[in-house]
Design a protein with these regions (language model features):
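Basic, polyanion-binding surface patches
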Residues: 1-185
């Protein structure tokens, strides 16, 4: 038997993105967003409303980074979604995060979060709240690599459970993509 919930924002895993951009004075700001993902090979799409300070900053600077929130920084990443940059201009400082300027786009990279997708703005539609960025680079700290490749266990990204308003860390490897299903060919 199944239980029907009606229309919900229930997709698993739902990523927890930390989106960062500079304001017109070069001050870094960031926010937590869960509605987003890869929309084309070198594009990322995120749904964020135009009243966010981060949205304003992205529209001004034409660039942003998307870091994966991690289990080590759940509280800090949650705070970035609770506090408004319109009211708290030093959110990153308050939660202890530090930034460096991306080598590839005019946007901040958060040092404490080991993976960042560095993007240039392609478009923003205020009606649908859809922001689209061209992926220019993905940078990953050595602490999240094994043999030069991203190690998901070391990265320890979290996902958002919209039913229960919880965060969960991604689990163990269960198979090999584009390989395990070959037995059915």
């Amino acid at each position: 038997m199944r239980k029907n919930f009606g229309p919900k924002t229930a997709v698993y895993p739902m990523p927890v993105f930390i989106i960062a951009a500079y304001d017109e004075n070069g001050v870094a700001n960031a926010m937590n967003a869960a509605w987003g993902g890869i929309s084309e090979e070198k594009e990322i799409s995120i749904c964020i409303s135009e009243d966010h300070k981060t949205t304003y900053n992205i529209l001004h600077s034409k660039a942003f980074t998307v870091s994966m929130a991690t289990a080590d920084f759940v509280k800090e990443c949650d705070y970035l979604g609770i506090a408004s940059g319109n009211k708290v201009p030093n959110k990153l400082e308050i939660c202890g995060f530090h930034t460096d300027k991306s080598e590839f786009v005019n946007a901040p990279v958060i040092r404490e979060l080991p993976m960042a997708v560095e993007c240039e703005l392609i478009s923003y539609d205020p009606e649908s709240c859809r922001l689209v960025g061209r992926i220019v680079n993905v940078s990953v700290d050595d602490s999240a690599l094994t043999d030069g490749k991203v190690d998901v266990a070391k990265l320890s990204p979290i996902c958002y459970d919209s039913f229960n308003h919880d965060y969960h860390v991604l689990g163990a490897k269960v198979g090999n993509a584009f390989s395990d299903g070959k037995e059915f060919l």
